[in-house]
Amino acid sequence: MSAIIQAFKDADLRKKIFFTIAMIVLYRIGAQIPSPGVDYATISGRLRDLTQDQSSVYSLINLFSGGALLQLSIFAIGIMPYITASIIVQLLTVVIPHFEELKKEGQSGQAKMMQYTRYLTVALALLQSSGIVALADREQLLGAGIRVLSADRNFFDLIVLVITMTAGAVLVMWMGELITEKGVGNGMSLLIFAGIATRLPTDGMNILGNSGGVVFAVVLASVLILVIGVVFVEQGQRRIPVQYAKRMVGRRQYGGSSTYLPLKVNQAGVIPVIFASSLIYMPVLITQIVNSGSLEVSDNWWQRNIIAHLQTPSSWQYIVLYFALTIFFSYFYVSVQYDPAEQAENMKKYGGFIPGIRPGRPTAEYLGFVMNRLLFVGSLYLAVIAVLPNIMLDLGVDAGSAGATPFGGTAILILVSVALTTVKQIESQLLQSNYEGLLK
């Protein structure tokens, strides 16, 4: 508690914390403001009766937006266009030499890639908002025949609605970047954190009201065990000893110190889960738009397979695909973000070496070997956490209403991971000011 008080006594850190809180509050306010032409009363009444199966196509995406998607607020599509754009740009660094060169150019290259990500975000936001509005106009967003837009709407009203939701997605992207730049923690992750956290009280009361006190107590106990397990794994790391050789500069002696290189078990964080969920969401949305807003049986074979296998998260095809995509993005994201050869070269440049391992290529191979072993465990851990709620649904465990997912494995993983990362960043700034760390 004293450390938290000290954090607010630091003028610079206090300013960053208040700025972050202000941005999150503005984001949550925007998530509750209906877009123009939306029948909010009808949506509110319909969402209370929406079942898990009916909302399955959008459940995780709606969770990330804090319920804004199915309410058709001005922030309805939230950060999903930005996440999808980030996936595409990261993939381009592997397949297109120009993007690979940009990645190697350091800060200037990263700035250029960020610019490409922003442009692509606007395009994807326009595409996704058009799809959502098309479904709403056909009265298929919340079920067949459910009207969520005003009855006297015209084409111009739909255009305004698309522009509003697109502008909202761009504004959310800007707010996330501002938090990262001027606040504490990762802005996009904190916005997802806020969206999930705001759903917890309401959905907890829904579980208590629908299933009774015994089930509610079991859910709380399960969540507590899950939180402990997630914290344990997220804090786990492999510490590789590093020795720095002594060297003389003039009459001064430098080096000779010992330290370690920390490699986390879950090096990728929550990014693979978010990537995988957004990638599964896109073909279902496109199929629903192409198929005149309906998820009924289609004559087209690819539409028929998507409808049969990806419409319901409890199907084993959905579970296997989600599991595989999470593992794939774990390996892909770490391979993009962490380069053992670059790490080994930096160590060699400053006179560092791993005892028993020769500097240069042998060090890079050793780091790659250790990282692959850790990544195997970490990716399996992420995949199991991600599909755990889906397996429970497949076994017949009723998750309640559409909003019960904040108590699922993915939501808990995101909440705990973002909280730990943010606290560690605050702690590092406290340590710079000679304050006691928050984690002590």
Curated annotation (Swiss-Prot):
Q: Indicate yes or no for the key word Zinc.
A: no
GO terms for biological process, alphabetical: intracellular protein transmembrane transport; protein targeting; protein transport by the Sec complex
Q: How the protein sits in the membrane?
A: Multi-pass membrane protein
What stretches pass through the bilayer? 17-37, 74-94, 116-135, 155-175, 178-198, 213-233, 270-290, 316-336, 374-394, 403-423
Principal place of residence: membrane
Disulfide bonds, paired cysteine numbers: none
Q: Which UniProt keywords apply?
A: Cell membrane, Membrane, Protein transport, Translocation, Transmembrane, Transmembrane helix, Transport
Q: Where does it localize? A: Cell membrane
The record's HAMAP family line, in alphabetical order, gives: SecY
What the entry lists under PANTHER family is as follows:
SECY/SEC61-ALPHA FAMILY MEMBER
Task: Give the family, as the similarity comment puts it.
Answer: Belongs to the SecY/SEC61-alpha family.
Name used for this protein in its record:
Protein translocase subunit SecY
The encoding gene is secY
